[in-house]
């Protein structure tokens, strides 16, 4: 991406992906605007986002979002807003559909107004591997059938399809089909962060056991800053398209647990982990792994392998536990 010549709008800028993306774009000299739906968080600001203009805006409010897009006139829009929790989508399915699905359409419509007025604008939707449901073939590509099995996946699938509609209409509209991606900023409601924290506490003698759900499901685990960089690459591509963002390396939760304990020099981990079937999620795909060949052809590649990723997450939690005294 050429340095310093874009006006960027990122929805969900205070989330994991939005935070890393905003920092990367601001460091490159771009004018960066970001939204969050919680007015108190916008007012409080974020020390890590110096130079980023924060706005209170909600994808549920079509008129307010439309006004913001018209005022900022972004040349690039990244829609990263909304909960990324599959588990939460089961308890709040209508809200998930409204924010993740219809909310994306509200933003697409606002972007279309800029496009229709002759203004250059490129749009990226943060899609998800959950749109593929429990796929029959691996690895998945951009052509894998869309067949979601969760409310989260269904909402993301609708947004994904609407991006294609606006692309066919003539707008530069893209999707980044994101597989699991982690960082020290990931909330502990997600399994990778939960494991990293639990292992750090066990290593420090703070607890004896780590309780998890199904540890035999497999996922393609990546590093969030790499995936933020991938979104930059996608919007800088010569043509709009859909792009799988993945490492191509499928590892089970069991593998993740073992690697996390290795990071604190504990090999005999089985006795320290309990599996609770009450924590199993309904309709959880057994295996998801992506083929990012289309994205790699643009020059992108992940910077970390699986072991290095897990080590970074665990070391961050070891430091956090130590700082708590």
Could you tell me what each predicted segment is?
Residues 62, 104-108, 231:
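Conserved internal alpha-helix within the Rossmann fold of NAD(P)-dependent oxidoreductases
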Residues 49-61:
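Rossmann-fold cofactor-recognition segment
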Residues 11, 35, 77-81, 123-129, ...:
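SDR active-site strand-loop-helix element
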Residues 30-41:
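Conserved glycine-rich Rossmann-like NAD(P)H-binding loop of the short-chain dehydrogenase/reductase
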Residues 91-109, 118-125, 130-175, 182-186:
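Catalytic helix-loop patch of NAD(P)-dependent Rossmann-fold dehydrogenases
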Residues 59-99:
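NAD(P)H-binding glycine-rich loop region in Rossmannoid oxidoreductase-like domains
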Residues 21, 27, 35, 64, ...:
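C-terminal substrate-binding subdomain of Rossmann-fold SDR/epimerase-dehydratase oxidoreductases
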Residues 9-26:
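N-terminal Rossmann NAD(P)H-binding glycine-rich loop of SDR-like oxidoreductase domains
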């Amino acid at each position: 991406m050429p340095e310093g010549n874009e006006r960027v709008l990122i929805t969900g800028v205070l989330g994991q992906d939005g935070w890393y993306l905003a920092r990367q774009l601001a460091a490159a000299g771009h004018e960066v605007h970001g939204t969050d739906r919680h007015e108190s968080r916008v007012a409080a600001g974020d020390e890590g986002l110096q130079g980023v203009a924060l706005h209170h805006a909600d994808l549920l409010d079509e008129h307010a979002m439309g006004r913001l897009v018209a005022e900022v006139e972004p040349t690039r829009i990244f829609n990263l807003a909304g909960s990324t929790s599959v588990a939460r989508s089961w308890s709040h399915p209508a809200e998930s559909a409204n924010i993740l699905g219809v909310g994306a359409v509200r933003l697409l419509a606002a972007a279309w107004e800029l496009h229709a007025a002759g203004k250059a604008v490129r749009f990226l939707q943060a899609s998800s591997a959950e749109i593929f449901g429990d796929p029959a073939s691996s690895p998945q590509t951009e052509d894998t059938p869309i067949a979601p099995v969760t409310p989260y996946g269904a909402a993301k699938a609708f947004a994904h399809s609407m991006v294609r509609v606006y692309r066919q209409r003539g707008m530069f509209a893209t999707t980044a089909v994101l597989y699991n991606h982690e960082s020290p900023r990931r909330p502990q409601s997600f399994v990778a962060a939960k494991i990293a924290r639990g292992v750090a506490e066990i290593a420090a003698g703070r607890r004896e056991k780590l309780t998890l759900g199904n540890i035999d499901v497999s996922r393609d685990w990546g590093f969030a800053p790499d995936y933020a960089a991938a979104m930059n690459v996608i919007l800088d591509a010569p043509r709009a398209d859909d792009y799988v963002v993945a490492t191509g390396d499928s590892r089970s939760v069991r593998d993740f647990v073992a690697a996390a304990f290795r990071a604190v020099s504990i090999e005999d981990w089985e006795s320290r982990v309990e599996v609770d079937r009450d924590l199993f999620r309904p309709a959880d795909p057994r295996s998801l792994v992506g083929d990012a060949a289309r994205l790699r052809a643009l020059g992108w590649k992940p910077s970390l392998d699986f072991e290095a990723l897990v080590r970074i997450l665990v070391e961050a939690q070891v430091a956090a536990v130590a700082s708590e005294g």
